[in-house]
């Protein structure tokens, strides 16, 4: 088990794993923090992340078993201790790890007597069994057991139809959920307008992913869901007091920031609030009054745009770009001779 003492940053938004352990081959636990957050942000992120962890991450499962010797699901086979239904339930519990897509075949070919476990499954090269000791069946007599299997990668639940028997083939209820459970909690600190929050996120997985891998996958899936909104273009809008149609671009500096969008740095910029930049109170208040709340909002404005803000001076612009050191990180052509 790994534990770290929690140290809270008062400046840059950051996340950290503060506890990590493997309780068994099929149960991993991780606890993470994200801070500092403004009031209300921790719940917003925590709720979305929990839903993504439980519903958006893909897993690999056995979805079908085939055998010509099986008349129906609740039948028994001489020499096997378990019923067919019990064997199917044991196959359902097998935890697999893979990056395959589509349906792939696997099989079990064993001669008794002896115990049949997960290590007896013959798998495609790209599929890994997390716990080879998982029990499947007990053969009491020297009989041959041949079962064909189908393996799929998906997400969420896949419920079998009521009539699932077809030519000795049985579909299996699949739970494509590497994350067993996820919880979030919020800790507030500070006073008055300075109040901030820490998000605590707890993740339990089945061993096919570590909690850190699950957090990364859920975050990426959430980003992918929101990217269409970032690339959308607002064609036009109507003013209430007249019928003039005005076409405005959604973002300024579209061409200059094309590369930035490609590598998703835009997402990071929208997560950095000007509250975290340690700006002078006067500059901070001027930006807030102009609806500039994040670093992304700030980068949409040229030097000339900033100078149009009431009570803003050239020294204030210099101060902002001095803090950001923007010329080292972003290609934005600002007139240097005015500094």
Swiss-Prot record:
The family database entries (Pfam families) matched by this protein are listed as: RNA_pol_A_bac, RNA_pol_A_CTD, RNA_pol_L
Q: Which CDD domains match?
A: RNAP_alpha_NTD (cd06928)
Q: What Enzyme Commission number(s) apply to this enzyme?
A: 2.7.7.6
Gene Ontology molecular functions: DNA binding; DNA-directed RNA polymerase activity; protein dimerization activity
Where is the segment annotated Alpha C-terminal domain (alpha-CTD)? 267-339
Q: Show the InterPro entries listed in the entry.
A: DNA-dir_RNA_pol_insert, DNA-dir_RNA_pol_RpoA/D/Rpb3, DNA-dir_RpoA, RBP11-like, RNAP_asu_C, RNApol_insert_sf
The cysteines joined by S-S bonds are: none
Q: What class of enzyme is it?
A: transferase
What biological-process terms (Gene Ontology) are attached?
DNA-templated transcription
Listed under GO cellular component are: chloroplast; DNA-directed RNA polymerase complex; mitochondrion
- Show the catalytic activity: RNA(n) + a ribonucleoside 5'-triphosphate = RNA(n+1) + diphosphate
| Keyword vocabulary terms for this entry | Chloroplast, DNA-directed RNA polymerase, Nucleotidyltransferase, Plastid, Transcription, Transferase
Q: Where is this region: Alpha N-terminal domain (alpha-NTD)?
A: 1-233
| Cell compartment(s), UniProt | Plastid, Chloroplast
Q: Which family does it belong to?
A: Belongs to the RNA polymerase alpha chain family.
Question: What function does this protein fulfil?
Answer: DNA-dependent RNA polymerase catalyzes the transcription of DNA into RNA using the four ribonucleoside triphosphates as substrates.
Quote the record's domain comment: The N-terminal domain is essential for RNAP assembly and basal transcription, whereas the C-terminal domain is involved in interaction with transcriptional regulators and with upstream promoter elements.
Kindly state the subunit structure of this protein: In plastids the minimal PEP RNA polymerase catalytic core is composed of four subunits: alpha, beta, beta', and beta''. When a (nuclear-encoded) sigma factor is associated with the core the holoenzyme is formed, which can initiate transcription.
Q: Under what name is this protein listed?
A: DNA-directed RNA polymerase subunit alpha
Source organism per entry reads Populus alba
